[in-house]
Amino acid sequence: MATEYALRMGDGKRIFLTKDKIIEELEAGMANASDLGEIPDLSGDEIDKLAEILMMPGKAVSVEQGMEVPVTHDIGTLRLDGDQGNSGVGIPSSRLVGCMMHERAFGADTMELGHIDYSYKPVKPVVANECQAMEVCQQNMIIPLFYGAMPNMGLYYTPDGPFENPGDLMKAFKIQEAWDSMEHAAAHLTRDTVWVMQKLFASGADGVNFDTTAAAGDADMYGTLHAIEALRKEFPDMYIEAGMAGECVLGMHGNLQYDGVTLAGLWPHQQAPLIAKAGANVFGPVCNTNTSKTSPWNLARAVNFMKAAVQASSIPCHVDMGMGVGGIPMLETPPIDAVTRASKAMVEIAGVDGIOIGVGDPLGMPISHIMASGMTGMRAAGDLVARMQFSKNMKIKEAKEYVAKKLNVETMDLADEYVMRELREELDIGVITSVPGAAKGIAAKMNIEKLLDVKINSCNLFRKQTR
């Protein structure tokens, strides 16, 4: 009797498959991506490698040593203090505590601050509060700290916003009116996002994370691209990450273009050049999980799409890997076996430059991803590599080589806690444990500026405030 391996369905349910069935599912998932995106198939060796990863006996697996990548985040501290019946675990804690827990306890390479409503439009009335929270976090933290939220263009339609819902207009065959409504909403999205980030950047934010770009279709992406363009023009040194909502841009409008390219119907490898053109530093491509398909089918499909996106992108790609995307099951408590296998496959086969950790409970998301493929932040040198990706648009190999040269170590040492623990204390660039007298917060970041030859926004703010 053939050996069966414990795997998952796209909804997280455990199933058992033989090796032959795993290969069959991998090839079918890959073929689906190839057909839809008109991209090359994975090679036979890559399919075999995927099967090998899926059949590994351990519950948790990880990348080969030396292949670790930085992680970025969606939803910020909401996975800790959120309590809405989804993936938040409802721990009463401040956002400062939540951010520092990710930095000090989880070994995150970067982190983000976000509002409980997690969209840019609701931030407007409370932006002063967000600015104060950002300032306090930046004074205490060392890893790059973004402000993150969703463009969420749906909030600009009735009953939540000023413009009539284009879905209702289209049902009434008022097509021109629907187009006008989407275009007006996109303009407001651009305006509001830029305004919010002007305030947050003035309060020391390292940058901005656009989470779930194009959730409301091509007009949502249109508004976001123009927001990125405006922010890049005004703030040349702002870190900008643009993550997508889905694998294909829905053509709700159908006629909108950016840089002469129609946005409707774009797949990840076609989205990447436009995100870079607008001025983002890092692109977060997405592949949606099909809950009625197996994990091999979903993972091969996701890896194939992401490999094509990485090859088409001139900027680093941090693949979105929350629940329901990137080959990960759609479950609030994502199974650790599925998460770590998907994380390893994305790094070793798709060649991604980083992982954007998305929705899911703390153990199933940040802890699992960081254990599987992360650089462990300040425990080693993950925060430094991430800074170079965002400061200079460096892909993972170049960023690691740059940092290793500055530290006078080998690239493999960048994720070695033993090497980096002593080196970080010697250079006074911040250590993860509480050492009396060691540089912390702004002081440590000022030393990082000198080491890496970069400018850090919170340090610039501090310098302006001193007399």
From Swiss-Prot:
Residues annotated as transmembrane: none
Which of the seven top EC classes does this enzyme belong to? transferase
Keyword Cell cycle set for record? no
Function summary: Catalyzes the transfer of a methyl group from dimethylamine to the corrinoid cofactor of MtbC.
Taxonomy of the source species: Archaea, Methanobacteriati, Methanobacteriota, Stenosarchaea group, Methanomicrobia
Pathway(s): One-carbon metabolism; methanogenesis from dimethylamine
From which source organism is this entry?
Answer: Methanosarcina mazei (strain ATCC BAA-159 / DSM 3647 / Goe1 / Go1 / JCM 11833 / OCM 88) (Methanosarcina frisia)
Designated name of the protein:
Dimethylamine methyltransferase MtbB3
Protein keywords:
Methanogenesis, Methyltransferase, Pyrrolysine, Transferase
Assigned EC number: 2.1.1.249
Q: Which InterPro entries match?
A: Dimeth_MeTrfase_MtbB
Q: Which family does it belong to?
A: Belongs to the dimethylamine methyltransferase family.
Instruction: Identify a single GO molecular function assigned to this protein.
Output: dimethylamine methyltransferase activity
GO BP annotations, alphabetical order = methanogenesis; methylation
Q: Which reaction does it catalyse?
A: Co(I)-[dimethylamine-specific corrinoid protein] + dimethylamine + H(+) = methyl-Co(III)-[dimethylamine-specific corrinoid protein] + methylamine
